[in-house]
Amino acid sequence: VDEEDDIVYFQAGTLDAGEATAQKAEGKKKEGEVSSGKAVVVKDKDVDLGTAGTHSVPRLKSMTSKLTLPMLKGKSRCNLDHLLSYKQTVDLSNARATHEQFQNWYDGVMASYELEESSMEIILNGFMVWCIENGTSPDINGVWTMMDDEEQISYPLKPMLDHAKPSLRQIMRHFSALAEAYIEMRSREKPYMPRYGLQRNLRDQSLARYAFDFYEITATTPVRAKEAHLQMKAAALKNSNTNMFGLDGNVTTSEEDTERHTATDVNRNMHHLLGVKGV
């Protein structure tokens, strides 16, 4: 018996038998998910808080465009964008030394005391507390002291004053916030009033944190504290006199005295009057 091969012809060139059935089943599954409420919901875009419906709430500019600006050759010479972000206050005050002056003071004192930076940190702590108690007057001299447990250690005050430009008080204003926090810490343990406040007879214990002469008044200083600090400063400066010139020690008599005196004269500045002596 001769075996003959059967030849099968397909209508399409792609063999996808049964694939249409799988696609139909998958389509029914998706339809079922939509009907069961599991369809993916596309959210609407967020609505800006400044809008209500189709109306937009206007925003005001920080600086109006109608300002009279410094002009040269018809062009403004100020940058308003930079000015809006430039909000420095403390470091611009003439009441405190500049960063360069403070650095020069620090380096000069460290060189004069022949100390390392780690030791200088301890020295500055002690000097700040000493200034809280004794002030930063330019008339102070001698030594300043620091306690090591029960031992009192003295340091010459001259390097602190010599390197302080423009003044020691302006240098110490860099320590104003730290000194205020130190007084507040001491007051939590027990009532503490700096010597500056005791001399001015400050009786309100809550104002002790402002009772030192290098306190830096800022915009956040309470009105009552500001008044108390200025009153203490006025009391400290009430009887102080500042003389521009001292006594000139180079004083000589440039006039020659040619007056002749005898033993019968009444006194050194008066001759006798026909033998009559004054009473």
UniProtKB/Swiss-Prot annotation:
InterPro entries hit by this protein: Poty_coat
Pfam families per record: Poty_coat (PF00767)
E.C. code: 2.7.7.48
Gene Ontology CC annotations of this record: viral capsid
Record site feature (Cleavage), residues: 11-12
GO molecular function: RNA-directed RNA polymerase activity
Post-translational modifications reported in the UniProt record: Genome polyprotein of potyviruses undergoes post-translational proteolytic processing by the main proteinase NIa-pro resulting in the production of at least ten individual proteins. The P1 proteinase and the HC-pro cleave only their respective C-termini autocatalytically. 6K1 is essential for proper proteolytic separation of P3 from CI.
Catalytic reaction list: RNA(n) + a ribonucleoside 5'-triphosphate = RNA(n+1) + diphosphate
Alphabetic keyword roster: Capsid protein, Nucleotidyltransferase, RNA-directed RNA polymerase, Transferase, Virion
Enzyme class label: transferase
Family note: Belongs to the potyviridae genome polyprotein family.
Protein name listed in UniProt: Genome polyprotein
Organism: Tamarillo mosaic virus
